[in-house]
A protein has these predicted regions:
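A short, N-terminal "cap"/entry segment at the start of jelly-roll beta-barrel domains
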Residues: 1-26, 108-124
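Conserved short histidine dyad/triad with adjacent acidic residue
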Residues: 14, 29-45
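Short histidine-centered beta-strand/loop micro-motifs
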Residues: 18-20, 40-45, 87-88, 107-108
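Short, charged/polar surface micro-motifs in flexible loops or helix N-caps
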Residues: 24-26, 34-38, 58-60, 101-104
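Well-ordered beta-strand scaffold positions
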Residues: 26, 66-68, 91
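Glycine- and acidic-residue-biased ligand/ion/polar-headgroup-sensing regions
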Residues: 47-49, 53-59, 64
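Short acidic-glycine-tyrosine-enriched beta hairpin
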Residues: 65-81
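Ligand-binding loop in jelly-roll beta-barrel domains
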Residues: 80-105
């Protein structure tokens, strides 16, 4: 059994990766809204915080009654209770959304990574 899975993510307005990759610790989606389009609802979560990473374009984020401008290169974290909705700007918007249970991160990067010496690629 392989220790990895690969999924195609091209040419879809929304791709959810939980099922495609059998994710067990987070939900990841890639979302694209055309020019001036909006998510058709406001939502919050019961447990999951969300991290949005804007890949292309710009738009507006309605969050708890406030509207803020968002654009390429920005990352936005929202608590589960935050009431949110995105609207694309005149050039559309493409973003990654990562959901995970608030407060669940116990190890990360240097505290979770382990250097492996018994196998390596040809370029090392």
């Amino acid at each position: 059994m392989k220790n990895y899975q690969v999924a195609k993510t091209l040419n879809e307005p929304r791709v959810e990766l939980k099922e495609a990759l059998n994710l067990t610790g987070c939900e990841v989606s890639i979302n694209e809204l055309p020019a001036n389009a909006s998510v058709p609802f406001v939502h919050a979560h019961k447990q999951n915080e969300e991290l949005y990473i804007i890949l292309e374009g710009d738009g507006e984020l309605f969050i708890d009654g406030e509207v803020i401008a968002v654009g390429k290169g920005e990352a936005i974290r929202i608590d589960p209770e935050g009431k949110r909705c995105f609207k694309a700007g005149k050039n559309g918007i493409k973003m990654i959304c990562i959901q995970s249970k608030k407060g669940s991160l116990e190890q990360y990067t240097m505290s979770d990574g382990v250097i492996v010496d018994d196998v390596k690629p040809s370029w090392l």
